[in-house]
Amino acid sequence: MASKFSAGLALFFLLASVAVLIAVAIVQVHKRSYESPGLRYGIVLDAGSSRTTVYLYQWPAEKENNTGVVNQTLRCLVDGPGISSFGQDAIQDQKTWNSMADCINRTKQAVPLDLQSSTPIFLGATAGMRLLRIQNETASDEILRSMEKYLRSLPFNFQNASIISGEEEGLYGWITANYLMGNFLERNLWNAWVRPHGAQTVGSLDLGGASTQIAFTAPLDEGIGTEGYTRVRLYGYEYNVYTHSFLCYGKNEAEKRVLAALAQSSSSTTVENPCFPVGFNTSMPAANIFGSPCTQQPPSYDPGQQLHLVGTGDPAGCRAIVQSIFDLASCHGRANCSFAGVYQPDISGDFMAYAGFYYTAAALKLGSSFTLEAFNSTAWAFCSTNWTSLKENYAIREIYLKSYCYSANYVYTLLVEGYKFTADTWNNIQFKKEVKKNSIAWSLGYMLTLSNMIPAEAKLLRLPMDNSVFAGLLFMFSALAILSLMFLIISLVRSCY
């Protein structure tokens, strides 16, 4: 009887010791925490054709597969036109500089003082400066130098101030759209960043003031080669991205081309515009239209000549004049051709349309997804509405409201006649401004790409218990388990005799 009791007691201590050992090991391994080395910051100035926007991004100092996990923490719009307008109006220039300083001060307040000197700051100028460089390279260089001088005077770590290419702008926009949609990384059940299983990328459609960009993944066409393709590596994976930028086909510059076509076909300085609503009239100097490198000046061009524009509210006439500025004939009878003779692989998959595309859809009171038929009928009704009714029914500033009939017809022509979206593939487009409170803009993709250059710092491992305590518990309960096992064996042997 005593031997059975001893054996039972030994078995109890053995099982208890093993259970405690397992519990201690689980706590030590699974309850460990990582002490992050903290956040890092980056600043991007998006110097667009119509305005400058300051973005502040942050990411953990440790990175996933060599690319930082970046989030937008601040977005500040600089009042005034884009930097390409510097030097035209001294008073306006000063207002723009003052507003830019206000935005920079907001970033100073957001970035901890001890991290400001290591926080990189970049300026990327887009189509407005690309046009100015074509028109006046000396002026564009002077503006970039003045911006660099200003950025170097700040407490941040200046990296560069440059004009990015249209293809880079399109690629960075594609990276932004897919990053925000979670197509590169997502958090799993253990709160770790992983690549989504079977993730598909979305194409991006960007409509700025002076250029428009399209980008999407597509297999390389061996018969064409690598024209328009870029291979990009993000979060440990490679992607073949087709991207193209059309300079002078941004919403504002394309409207100047429409106005130029109307003015040159008019026999007087009074110009009927089918894209302006009935009841809207305005005057402007010819320089506002023909001063752009995107328009062709007439033989008898007088910059100061006043042109009187009269709205006729004709949706069919508006679409016809908008289509006339696209070189569609050069792609006639050619496969894989968008317009202006530019190669483009077949459209496939989902797309994210942002910037001017989004604002046009929002102005027409459409949601993020709608059919091509709904877009056409809404645009037709909008274009047929007189100026008085538009002002009463749309809470949009008049400077923008007058042009949304043109914008709607431009978006239709670009997407359907240019990029070759059909009634079916149109349904794959989402018109959005932001995702998860992050703006859809090329600047985030720019920051993600540049964060590859910023070294990662390792996390500091913090365990639930000190190593000496863990070792002591491990030794004590291991010894107890061994002794219990020995005592159990002895008890069982004795019970046999």
Outline where the language-model segments fall:
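A short acidic-Thr-Gly-centered motif at the start of a beta-strand
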Residues: 27-37, 188-197
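Helical "lid/coupling" subdomains associated with nucleotide-phosphate turnover
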Residues: 42, 56, 80-114, 122, ...
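Beta-propeller domains
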Residues: 63-72
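Helix-loop boundary elements of multi-pass alpha-helical membrane proteins
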Residues: 1-13, 39, 490-497
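Hydrophobic alpha-helical cores of multi-pass transmembrane domains in eukaryotic membrane proteins
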Residues: 13-20, 47, 478-482
